[in-house]
UniProtKB/Swiss-Prot annotation:
Residues carrying covalently attached carbohydrate according to the record: N190
Spans through the membrane: 94-114, 118-138, 140-160, 202-222, 223-243, 269-289, 354-374, 391-411, 428-448, 454-474, 495-515
Primary location: membrane
Record topology, Cytoplasmic segments: 1-93, 139, 244-268, 375-390, 449-453, 516-960
Gene this protein is translated from: SLC26A8
Single Gene Ontology MF annotation: oxalate transmembrane transporter activity
Subunit composition and interactions: Interacts with RACGAP1. Interacts with CFTR; stimulates anion transport activity of CFTR.
Keyword annotations from UniProtKB, A to Z: Anion exchange, Developmental protein, Differentiation, Glycoprotein, Ion transport, Meiosis, Membrane, Spermatogenesis, Transmembrane, Transmembrane helix, Transport
Region annotated Disordered, chain positions: 807-857, 881-960
Skewed-composition ranges (Basic and acidic residues): 818-827
Organism: Bos taurus
Gene3D superfamilies: STAS domain
The name this protein goes by in its record: Testis anion transporter 1
């Protein structure tokens, strides 16, 4: 059956199609948008809310849906028991339960050999059965097998050293059967069992408290790399512990930091005493299990493995009972235990304080191993586990186990893998395995006493080996994420070198540190505009990104906190080539001094009584000012490109009102040309300077094109900074203080700072922390980045510098001395920089209204007017869409502030916008050039803007 062709061509059809949209709306900032559109809830706490309506009443009622959800959370077994699919899951659960139960029997028998403590195996069996039932009811992992784990029990060796029995031979690795007729042996043995029960009880209480207090959320912050590394280290510890069964030798087992290498050395020293029969049996089991991986069985399309572990346990147990094999088994260990079963008793509460440290260590390791293993298994089957519920479940298991004077229980790594791969789908498999284990231990325990320990070691190593294969994924993990690879290596090495308990603490601490660094190390991108669109992308990603003259756009890609806010400020200052200068004490005092104190400054000492409450300390406006970085005068200059002249005659008068200008031509860029002398241009319009502008010939026009740097353009100075907060979800209180001071400092430097794409949650955070005042209002917050850019372009650009001429192509550089810079910044301290398109903000009343011109030559006219006042007869061409024969007719004007009257538009404005320099040199064109230019203008008139707003007409000054 072939799929529908329409479905196949869906992606191709829509990939080839292009969609356009045309939206007409005003430029919105946060202030006028909230005025026009009503919000559902108040954004600040100082607004009265009418709670008389029914929708605001708190409804405290319990529905059946909520009750059922709460019941299924506390008792997860109800979900799988009520919806159990017998036809699909029953056979797999039975097969997995039989495999797990048969493997658990020899593990219980040989546990005393590894844990160096002799507990009646029937007590451990009863405790394991109760633990499986409890976890089946309260646990959330479907394939988890609960039981004793040697590595967890080995952490209690320090407790056994304080309460030894049998003269401590077990701890030294020598198994000598004690004299049961000695009464002191029973006293020491019972005291040792009481200590183990106390440790297990306190461990369960700690885990139960952690689950009820919700400490399971910590697992959500532990990355997958840390979990994988910890399980790999656990697998390596398990492999090392099984060397006792593989080689048939006993060593003095060590625990704690560097114990891993001490045990390796002890095993190497004991290799001459290794049992060859045990090694051969181990290799036989490994080969059989390896071949078994090639056998594929599926039941109802669910893959399962052949239960080879069942045949190995039953086969070698039967063979060893018929044939005497010279290998290590559990028979000798069972003969050293004085009791076959001890009835449950209440643990001793008097020594809980003595085992507090060991219990806390066991609680961390056992709960972490259970949760990590559960998350790993659940990720394979695409479901989630509840970490808090698992902590409660394992805590109850250990509390119940303490009454049987058993070990601490956790997730058994090898049996969990066996239950998963043999088809176990729900906790019903664990219940089946626990029932089979208890039944066989009560009726047929001696049948398994002669089972070789090497067979059990082969089964365990074969099943935990896949967790160690994660080492092979390190190269790919390094290529994907270096931070995760670093977490993996640190977790693995700490768990190996320092042990599972201390290594766990180090791994979690390091993972939290890396996550904190990643979350607070924000990425600041400099954005530009994709031509003819409202899309803004980073300059590092796209080649056609265009810079907007006078505007810098910074995108913050993370939360802004006290950690990275200074990096944001430093990045902004670097991009706009400015440095921060700390204010002096006199300048800070001037900021905080009140007007009424000016009359009493002459008094040295004043004494008066003031019984009123002390007023709150004034807000720090800013503690530093921003200045252009020294050595980069290009940030302080305005470059204007003029036409080429053959001669220049200047008549000038020196006075204090004149401003120095340096005329730099193309000869300054090339040492082959002669240097240009400095001239003085008058700043007073009453004074004039007469310059003759001869017409350039065709030869000179062609020569102009060959001048070096003749086509270079330099952007105007920065007047607006836009911060894109569309990816910012949090701004803390300290970061808001730094941002507020940064806004004020930039305002003092005549640079306006706008925020775009600010989330409502961040806006409420700004309001709660009193971010807005008379100088910073919501008019500086824009809904989108394009709104902020349009507003920045609608503002009047900085006034262009005076014009001068030279015999060659001339570039005028406006320079100021350091004293003039400081005086200019002081004059502009109280000057505001923002004017909302729709409403005025009260904090910016000192700034005169920007002149919104209908034509696109705002700065051009002021430059032409100055040039005419100084006697400069210039003919500037802005490459605008006008008729070729249209010319600017000179006008004699006495007033410098006279505005240029708007001319009616001859044709619609073009749709394409390109941002270039404001001024270009006019070059007399030949008729051929004029005709070609006219044709390009006609072609550009074919694309018409969908709409034209009066508020954006000043933006045409950047359109060429």
């Amino acid at each position: 059956m072939q799929p529908d062709r329409s479905f196949q061509s869906f992606a191709s059809r829509y990939r080839q199609s292009s969609f356009t949209y045309d939206v007409k709306r005003d430029v919105y900032n946060e202030e006028n948008f909230q005025q026009e559109h009503r919000k559902k809830t108040a954004s600040s706490g100082n607004v009265d809310i009418d709670i008389s309506t029914v929708s605001h009443h708190v409804q405290c009622r319990c529905s059946w849906h909520k009750f059922r959800r709460c019941l299924l959370t506390v008792f997860p077994f109800l979900e799988w028991m009520c919806f159990y699919r017998f036809k699909d899951w029953l056979l797999g659960d039975l097969l997995a339960g039989i495999s797990v139960g048969l493997v658990q029997i020899p593990q219980v028998l040989m546990l005393g050999l590894l844990a160096r403590h002799l507990i009646p195996p029937l007590n451990v069996s009863y405790a394991a059965f109760c633990a499986s039932v409890i976890y089946g009811i309260f646990g959330s992992c479907h394939q988890m097998s609960i039981g004793t784990f040697f590595l967890v029990s080995a952490l209690a060796i320090n407790v056994l050293r304080t309460q030894p029995f049998n003269r401590g031979h077990l701890l030294l690795g020598t198994f000598i059967q004690a004299d049961f007729s000695n009464t002191s042996f029973y006293e020491n043995y019972n005291r040792s069992l009481s200590s183990v029960a106390s440790v297990t009880l306190l461990t369960g209480i700690i885990q139960l408290s952690m689950g009820m207090l919700g400490f399971g959320f910590i697992v959500a912050y532990i990355p997958e790399a840390a979990i994988s590394a910890y399980l790999a280290a656990t697998a390596l510890h398990v492999m090392l512990s099984q060397l006792t069964c593989i080689f048939g030798i006993m060593i003095s087992y060590n625990s704690g930091p560097i114990a891993f290498f001490y045990n390796i050395i002890n095993y190497c020293l004991g290799l001459p005493k290794a049992n060859s029969t045990s090694i051969l049996l181990f290799l036989t089991a490994m080969v059989a299990l390896r071949i078994n991986k090639c056998i594929r069985i599926s039941f109802n399309e669910y893959p399962i493995e052949f239960p080879m572990e069942v045949f190995l346990v039953l086969g070698f147990a039967a063979f060893s009972n018929k044939v005497n094999m010279a290998t290590e088994n559990s028979l000798m260990l069972m003969e050293m235990i004085p009791y076959s079963f001890l009835f449950p008793v209440t643990p001793d509460m008097s020594n809980l304080t003595e085992v507090l440290i060991e219990s806390f260590s066991l609680a961390l390791v056992s709960s972490s191993l259970l949760v990590f293993l559960g998350k790993k298994i659940a990720s394979f089957h695409n479901y989630d586990v509840n970490s808090n519920q698992d902590l409660i479940a394992i805590g109850l298991c250990n509390v119940v186990s303490s009454f049987f004077r058993s070990y601490v229980f956790t997730g058994a790594v090898a049996r969990t893998i066996i239950q998963d791969k043999t088809g176990g789908r729900q906790q019903f498999a664990s219940l089946v395995g626990a029932g089979i284990m208890l039944l066989l231990m009560m009726k047929m325990a001696r049948f398994f006493y002669r089972l070789p320990n090497a067979i059990v070691a082969g089964i365990i190593l074969s099943n935990v080996l896949p967790y160690l294969e994660a080492v092979y994924t390190l190269p790919s993990l390094w290529r994907q994420n270096q931070y995760d690879c670093l977490i993996w290596m640190v977790t693995f090495m700490s768990a190996i070198l320092l042990g599972l308990d201390i290594g766990l603490v180090v791994a979690v601490t390091f993972a939290f540190f890396i996550i904190t660094v990643q979350s607070h190390r924000t990425k600041i991108l400099l954005l530009g505009q994709i031509p003819n669109t409202n899309i803004y992308r980073s300059f590092q990603d796209y080649r056609e990104v265009a810079n907007i003259p006078g505007v810098k756009i910074f995108q913050c890609c993370n939360a802004i906190t006290f950690v990275n806010v200074h990096y944001l400020k430093r990045k902004v200052l670097e991009e706009i080539e400015m440095v921060k200068m700390p204010l002096t004490e006199e300048e800070i005092y001037t900021l905080f001094s009140q007007n009424e104190e000016g009359a009493q400054r002459g008094k040295i000492c004043r004494c008066y009584c003031n019984c009123d409450e002390p007023e709150p300390s004034p807000r720090v406006i800013y503690t530093e000012r921003y200045e252009v970085q020294r050595g980069r005068e290009s940030s302080f200059i305005n470059l204007v490109r003029c036409s080429r002249f053959e001669s220049m005659n200047t008549a000038q008068t020196m006075s204090e009102d004149q401003v120095p200008y340096i005329t730099s031509s193309s000869s300054q860029r090339n040492p082959n040309y002669e240097e240009v002398e400095k001239v003085w241009l008058s700043d007073d319009p009453s004074r004039s300077m007469t310059i003759t502008l001869p017409e350039a010939s065709d030869t000179q026009v062609r020569a102009t094109k060959l001048l070096p740097y003749s086509t270079s353009t330099i952007l105007p100075s920065i007047h607006t900074i836009i911060l894109d907060f569309s990816m910012v979800h949090l701004v803390d209180a300290r970061a808001l203080v730094v941002l507020r001071q940064m806004f004020s400092a930039f305002q003092n430097a005549n640079i306006l700072v706008l925020i775009a794409g600010c989330h409502s949650f961040v806006v409420r955070s700004l309001e709660k922390n009193d971010f807005f005042d008379a100088g910073i209002t919501k008019a500086q917050l824009f809904l989108t980045l394009h709104d902020a850019v349009l507003f920045a372009l609608s503002r009047k650009l900085p006034e262009s510098s005076e014009l001068s001429v030279d015999e060659s192509e001339t570039v005028i550089q406006e320079t100021f001395s350091e004293t003039d810079k400081k005086e200019e910044s002081r004059h502009k301290t109280n000057r505001s920089l923002i004017e909302a398109p729709r409403s005025k903000s009260p904090g910016f009343s000192l700034l005169p209204d920007p002149e919104m011109e209908e034509e696109s030559d705002l700065d051009l006219y002021s430059t032409i007017q100055m040039s005419k006042d100084h006697g400069l007869d210039l003919d500037l061409d802005l490459d605008r869409e006008v008729e070729p024969e249209s010319e600017l007719e000179p006008e004699s004007e006495l007033d410098q502030e006279t505005e240029l009257e708007p001319e009616p538009e001859a044709s619609p404005k073009p749709n394409r916008q390109k941002y270039w320099s404001l001024f270009r040199a006019i070059i007399p064109r030949s008729p051929t050039q004029t005709q070609a230019r006219t044709q390009s203008v006609d072609r550009r008139h074919q694309n018409v803007k969908p709409y034209t707003s009066k508020a954006d007409t000043s933006e045409d000054a950047l359109e060429i």
